[in-house]
Every structure is written in structure tokens, then in C-alpha cells.
Amino acid sequence: DKHWIYYPEKEFIFHRNFIQSNISPYLAPLGTSSITCEISYSPYKKIDKEKIVERVVNDLILANYIDRNDEILAEDIVDLKYAYIIPDIDYKSKIKKVFDFLESNHIYSAGRFAEWEYYDTDDAILSGKRTAEKMGSG
């Protein structure tokens, strides 16, 4: 029934899992689940990309999300090098200059990365809606 599960424990490689099939049964084939495991890394916190799937599966078993005998039907790795915003002390004034320039050229920003905000899914949808309204009125 949960769709976002956080794992602060250091024993798990992932820190957040998104279970799409708990949002809608249409997001996975009948009788199966769909899960995204979010893993952060940096030059200071390295991961072994060759063994990442094996580690994730083992950690999902450890977290009692899957059973050792469960069949994994598909796997995919998406590496987002710049997935998290890391602001500096003056980032708001810098971003305002960029946004002002873009909007003066009728370029509109929408979403988590474009707006430099930490958005959940509902916030991202509302951001897109606001941007669409802005574009429609311009």
C-alpha cells in the first residue's frame, strides 16, 4: 500500500524506493510489482556499477520487500549525474538572473531541475500546470 519508502539505514545501498504498482495496478503486469530504487553516490561515496543490480536485489531481500525466489522480470539502470541540487550561499540571486533572462526570451522553466526546487510528483505536476498557464497567457 505504500508507494514511497525511505531507508536511512546504512546497511542498504538505496535510500528511497518508489513502488509504482502501489499507485496503480496498471503500472506493472498483473501479479507483479514495479519498483524504483534510488541510490546516491559521489566521489566520496562510490558504488560498484558492475555489481549494482545484484546489491539492490540482495538489499530488497534484506528489507523484506522481495523473496529470494522471486523472479526479476526486468531491470534498468538510469544514472542521473546531477540528480540533486546543491546550492551555494548566493544561489537564489543567481537563479533569479537566469530565470529573468529566460522569461524575457519566452523560455519557461518547469519542474524540479528547471526551477531548482525539491519537488515531489504532485509539485512537479503543478509546476507544469503553472508554466502551461503562463505560456498560454503570453
Describe the residue ranges of each PLM region.
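C-terminal segments that line or cap access tunnels to active or ligand-binding sites in enzymes
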Residues: 1-108
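A conserved FAD-binding loop/helix module that cradles the flavin
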Residues: 102, 107-136
